Amino acid sequence: MAWLICLWIFNLMEKPAQKPHYPYFSSGPCAKPPGWSFDNLKNAALSRSHSSGAAVKKLQEVIDKSRQLLEIPDDYLIGIVPASDTGAVEMAMWCMLGQRGVEVYSWENFGHDWNIDAGEQLPLKDKKLIKAEYGELPDFSNSNPDNDIVFTWNGTTAGVRIKNTDWISNQRKGLTICDATSAVFSMHMDWHKLDVITYSWQKVLGSEAAHGMLILSPRAVERLETFTPPWPIPKIFRLANNQKLISGIFSGATINTPSMISVEDVLNSLNWGLELGGLNKLIDISETNLKLVNNWIDKHDNFEFLAKDPETRSCTSICILPKDEWFKTLNDEDKVNFMKEVCSLLESNEAGYDLNSYKTAPPGIRIWGGSTVENKNVELVLPWIDWAYLTTKEAFKK
């Protein structure tokens, strides 16, 4: 009997035979689209002014193809803004909040950051800050349609997404400001429930960092043209002058100088998505990645989802935790160090990069499952995660 147990342990510890052919699972910047190469950038408008006709044409093309791929309503404005998704969210909050009461819903790191903006940085008089722990959603049921609402569609650091937008009133008087950076292109957006939508190029599109996208409904534009906040607005955040929308932002005249090589790269990603089959195809890839992880967890004892409710599990930032009793006996510092060793082992074997959970999240694994991550690569990294976990566990126990 003892030799059978030893053989079983040996088989668990044996390295998987196959590695992902593209072992990149970072949650930002994320994996490049399949087949990407530097040749894709050869037509970039390099050495040209970003306000030249050639550059503005490319910037406008980013706007137009984003609308096409995301199926954004025609009466919504789309702008390219500085400082990635963070810049887009904060310019919306600083330019639009203050007219009404505001509710900020958060359940992971970046949502908590918007909570800090509303709760500590902006002098808002009427505010409700509604938080939930990692792995859970806050209670949306008492949301007041007279208030402005700030929330993330998908919590990137928790792997928890909203179930639906039923809690947002069609007769709302307030604005909804949605950080959708790890949701767009991999999840269907309920555009008519959203007034301000933000995201970056570096997430599901697999493009480069530092550039954000800001999408405004007609109601959001009306707010900018009828309300001026009582605090100063830096130029980098400014969307209106004297209650008049700076419309150039939404036609390729960016607030500051964009990287034209990054512009070319995001155009490549948008073209890839359109040629692949559009939004539904991108969503299908990502949802299949979640199913692969779910099926693997169902058959193994080492991990569980951070999100307990299956309906809230993200198909992009897929967060899993060790669940065996041995791991639970470790103190917090040892849990963090243990998972660092697991991820270091995966990297040293070139089986998977950047799989560690976010620094403020419970120690675990975060697999990026966005649409640029091919299903086969997710399928192949899972046995490697098992192997790395068991191998590290044996070393830790000695």
Predicted regions and their residues:
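Conserved active-site segment immediately N-terminal to the catalytic lysine
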Residues: W191-Q202, G212
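N-terminal "arm"/small-domain region of PLP-dependent enzymes with the aminotransferase-like
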Residues: W8-G53
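Conserved PLP-dependent catalytic core of the aminotransferase class-I/II
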Residues: K65-P73, W272-A307, L345
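Conserved N-terminal alpha-helix of the aminotransferase class I/II PLP-enzyme fold
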Residues: D39-M91, C95, N109-D117, D298
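Active-site C-terminal subdomain of aminotransferase-like
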Residues: Q202-N295
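PLP-dependent aminotransferase-like
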Residues: G87, W94-I149
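Active-site phosphate-binding strand-loop segment of PLP-dependent enzymes
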Residues: E133-F185, V196, V204
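Conserved C-terminal alpha-helix-loop-beta "cap" of PLP-dependent enzymes
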Residues: D298, N302-K376, L380
